[in-house]
């Protein structure tokens, strides 16, 4: 085992490498993507919107990413926002301008699919009204309008990037969507005329960034470009396989890569799952291993568990291997990146969930019926902690024995090798375990 910075990490030229979140998000995908992007020609987003968020520290600068692919930090990579993404144009340009102010040259390095759906202010208004209607049973969305944007997509009333360049069609769709929302919510005041003027200006500003993403990505594959896909959110937030209805509105699994970029499954060469060494979640929804005690408080404080997008405190608990086994079955990980191992350094003992007892029966796969989890008993394996710093360790041989046992148990339980191990917040504090 050695530091990533010493060994280098290569990305295949024989197909797409995908980085996916394996839990409820915030696993640390951005840092791995940043490292991998040192050797990438194309970095792409395939789903979600600016509800995702992560921070990258490079070249003495801190960069916050929400809608843009983090491959922009590497001056050699070209970046693509795919067809499965929903894009709020003011946020797109705001984020881009912030990167340029910090010295990143983004010229001819960021492109957006002409098939991507657009998010508008009326989607954000609808998002807030939906949450208010749900009251105590609200989902805990980011309020960015992502769900309503995917809703209009599903009902075929959505507006795509290419509609900006067929203005009569754009205007007709825009006016109808606002009228429909006014019928739905009643008091829904909205400056349609002002927004249409704004979007005419944004259309002209956006035009140099718009591409046929299908031709773009398949040309890259044909030319043996090194392509990395940066997953947003995570498996347990997937619309179909997550903790429904406490999920996001897109497909955040490996299937979403194919549908969001327009590539066949055989084009994917390598799938890396990112796993936090414990578990966190933002917003409402089931969380079987949540620790509403000093353990959760310690993880939250030491792990600096605040959302990049919302600033909300993350809920914290022990690692859940039932969730991760389920995640592995669906996404088919070739390897894992275990992050934030150092946050566990001070614990005298560490627990890992290996099964649930539901209605008197032991289950080892995550159930669809979330109500059954409310009374579930969690079966844990308990490990002695290592109670020594892992930050600064550069070789597997120097890793505390109890930390090795923890890592090896996870590998054996899931049947997937842990290739990357994070032992600190810095870009160079990631070890490659061969």
Curated annotation (Swiss-Prot):
IMP binds at residues 26-29, 51-54, 142, 156, 233, 248, 312. Keywords: Cytoplasm, GTP-binding, Ligase, Magnesium, Metal-binding, Nucleotide-binding, Purine biosynthesis. The active site is at 26 (proton acceptor), 54 (proton donor). SMART domains: Adenylsucc_synt. It is found in: Cytoplasm. GO terms for molecular function: adenylosuccinate synthase activity; AMP binding; GMP binding; GTP binding; magnesium ion binding. It holds the Pfam family Adenylsucc_synt. GTP binds at residues 25-31, 53-55, 314, 340-342, 422-424. Its cofactor is Mg(2+). Its EC number is 6.3.4.4. Plays an important role in the de novo pathway and in the salvage pathway of purine nucleotide biosynthesis. Catalyzes the first committed step in the biosynthesis of AMP from IMP. PANTHER family: ADENYLOSUCCINATE SYNTHETASE. Homodimer. This is Adenylosuccinate synthetase.
């Amino acid at each position: 085992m050695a530091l990533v910075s010493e060994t280098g990490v290569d990305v295949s030229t024989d197909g797409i490498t995908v980085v996916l979140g394996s839990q409820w998000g915030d696993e640390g995908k951005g840092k791995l993507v940043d490292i991998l992007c040192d050797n990438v020609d194309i970095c792409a987003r395939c789903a979600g919107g600016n509800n995702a968020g992560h921070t990258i520290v490079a070249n003495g600068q801190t960069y916050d990413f929400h809608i843009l692919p983090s491959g922009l930090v590497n001056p050699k990579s070209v970046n693509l926002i795919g067809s499965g993404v929903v894009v709020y144009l003011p946020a797109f340009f705001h984020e881009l301008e912030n990167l340029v102010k910090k010295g990143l040259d983004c010229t001819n390095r960021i492109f957006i699919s002409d098939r991507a759906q657009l998010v508008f202010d009326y989607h954000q208004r609808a998002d807030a009204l939906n949450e208010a209607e749900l009251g105590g049973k609200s989902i805990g969305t980011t309020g960015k309008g992502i769900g309503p944007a995917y809703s209009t997509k599903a009902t075929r009333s959505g507006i795509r990037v290419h509609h900006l360049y067929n203005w009569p069609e754009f205007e007709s769709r825009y006016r109808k969507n606002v009228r429909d929302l006014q019928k739905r919510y009643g008091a829904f005041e909205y400056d349609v005329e002002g927004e249409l003027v704004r979007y005419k200006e944004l259309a002209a500003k956006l035009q140099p960034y718009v591409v046929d993403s299908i031709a773009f990505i398949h040309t890259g594959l044909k030319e043996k470009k090194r392509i990395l896909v940066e997953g947003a959110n995570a498996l347990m937030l997937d619309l179909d396989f997550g903790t429904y209805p406490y999920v996001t509105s897109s497909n955040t699994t490996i299937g979403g890569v194919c549908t969001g970029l327009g590539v066949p499954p055989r084009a994917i060469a390598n799938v890396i799952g990112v796993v936090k060494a414990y578990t966190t979640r933002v917003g409402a929804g089931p969380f079987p291993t949540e620790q509403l005690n000093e353990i959760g408080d310690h993880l939250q404080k030491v792990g600096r568990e605040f959302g990049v997008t919302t600033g909300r405190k993350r809920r914290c608990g022990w690692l859940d291997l039932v969730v991760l086994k389920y995640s592995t079955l669906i996404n088919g990980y070739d390897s894992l990146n275990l992050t934030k191992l150092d946050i566990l350094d001070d614990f005298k003992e560490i627990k890992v969930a290996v099964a649930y007892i539901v209605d008197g029966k032991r289950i080892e796969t995550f159930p669809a019926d979330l109500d059954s989890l409310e009374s579930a008993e969690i079966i844990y394996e308990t490990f002695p902690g290592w109670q020594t710093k892992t930050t600064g360790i550069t070789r597997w041989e120097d890793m505390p024995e109890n930390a090795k046992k923890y890592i090896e148990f996870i590998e054996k339980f899931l049947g997937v090798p842990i290739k990357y191990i994070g032992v600190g917040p810095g870009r160079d504090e990631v070890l490659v375990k061969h």
